[in-house]
């Protein structure tokens, strides 16, 4: 009996100490996961289904009254504006290049950058995609990358489009700020509007008359691609600089008919040999490979 009494007293004391500590300091209560039923959903986590302003409800003419004829007209408007297929947008960062000279015309791909682009072209060929559109930034390094890729994939070179909106730039002041890269406020003002315009031009759900899934290839730049990813996934756009992607990498985003967006690849370069992987401008102007 004495052993049992001692055990009972010890157990009781343990429970008492536990509950005393819990009541004394509720902050030390440990939940079984980071999320729990008492945690409120952050405002920035809520999905905006009309982010591209192409939700059928925003395109249909509102009902004027509750009469059956008006309801039928409204429902017909909704149906007429419904997307039926997905849009796949594949973003390629240009290959490694040399930042020499004062103008873009002197910023050519290095030998390694050209090799990277060739590996990317072969990878895209292996994926067997039938491309609907190919668009490239009009900067030299993106044009050269696109030209090399086009030698590997099945697409009519005469149909390639160049776009000045896709030029490299400073999309939005990053958070957290970094000390090694501080553009002037005027550059963010100028580049940010242009890059946002590029996003709105190329990122939207399929038009209602699209008859199959479409595949668009865009050859561009690191800052622009990272900004596009944040905007498309509705992550805070200020976080774009937290993402790092290699030269000639593949980023694949899919926009479903409902307007939902998913990412299949982010900066994929697994098809490029490790010795040829880069993400920064090389220090040396010669003997890059």
From Swiss-Prot:
Enzyme class: hydrolase
Family according to the record: Belongs to the phosphoglycerate mutase family. BPG-dependent PGAM subfamily.
GO annotations of cellular component type: mitochondrial outer membrane
Function description: Displays phosphatase activity for serine/threonine residues, and dephosphorylates and activates Pk92B kinase. Has apparently no phosphoglycerate mutase activity.
Domain of life from the UniProt record: Eukaryota
Organism of this sequence: Drosophila mojavensis
Principal location: mitochondrion
Organism placement in taxonomy: Eukaryota, Metazoa, Ecdysozoa, Arthropoda, Hexapoda
Subunit relationships: Interacts with Pk92B/ASK1.
Reaction it catalyzes: O-phospho-L-seryl-[protein] + H2O = L-seryl-[protein] + phosphate; O-phospho-L-threonyl-[protein] + H2O = L-threonyl-[protein] + phosphate
PANTHER family per record: PHOSPHOGLYCERATE MUTASE-RELATED, SERINE_THREONINE-PROTEIN PHOSPHATASE PGAM5, MITOCHONDRIAL
EC number assigned by the record: 3.1.3.16
Any single biological process term in GO: protein dephosphorylation
Localization annotation: Mitochondrion outer membrane
Record keywords: Hydrolase, Membrane, Mitochondrion, Mitochondrion outer membrane
Signal peptide start-end: none
Family matches, as InterPro entries: His_Pase_superF_clade-1, His_PPase_superfam, Mito_Ser/Thr_phosphatase
Any one Pfam family match given in the protein's UniProt record, by short name: His_Phos_1
Protein's name according to its UniProt entry: Serine/threonine-protein phosphatase Pgam5, mitochondrial
GO MF, one annotated term: protein serine/threonine phosphatase activity
């Amino acid at each position: 009996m004495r052993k049992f009494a001692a055990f009972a007293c010890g157990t009781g004391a343990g429970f008492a100490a536990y509950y005393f500590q819990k009541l004394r300091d509720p902050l030390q209560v440990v939940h079984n996961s980071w999320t729990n039923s008492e945690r409120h959903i952050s405002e920035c986590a809520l999905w905006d289904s009309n982010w591209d302003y192409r939700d059928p409800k925003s395109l249909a003419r509102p009902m004027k009254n509750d009469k059956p004829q008006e309801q039928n007209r409204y429902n017909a408007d909704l149906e007429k504006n419904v997307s039926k297929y997905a849009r796949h947008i594949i973003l390629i960062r240009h290959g490694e290049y040399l930042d020499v000279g004062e103008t873009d015309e002197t910023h050519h791909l290095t030998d390694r950058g050209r090799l990277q682009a060739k590996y990317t072209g072969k990878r895209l060929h292996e994926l067997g995609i039938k491309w609907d559109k190919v668009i490239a930034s009009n900067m030299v390094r993106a044009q050269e990358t696109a030209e090399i890729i086009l030698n590997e994939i099945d697409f009519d070179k005469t149909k390639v489009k160049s776009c000045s909106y896709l030029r490299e730039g400073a999309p939005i002041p990053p958070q957290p700020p970094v000390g090694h890269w501080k553009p002037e406020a005027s550059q963010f003002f100028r580049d940010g509007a242009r890059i946002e315009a590029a996003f709105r031009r190329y990122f939207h759900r399929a038009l209602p008359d699209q008859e199959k899934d479409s595949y668009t290839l865009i050859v561009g730049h690191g800052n622009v691609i990272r900004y596009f990813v944040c905007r498309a996934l509705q992550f805070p756009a200020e976080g774009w600089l937290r993402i790092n992607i290699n030269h000639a990498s593949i980023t694949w985003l899919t926009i479903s008919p409902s307007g939902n967006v998913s990412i299949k690849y982010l900066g994929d370069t697994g098809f490029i040999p490790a010795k040829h992987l880069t993400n920064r401008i090389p220090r040396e102007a010669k003997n890059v490979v």
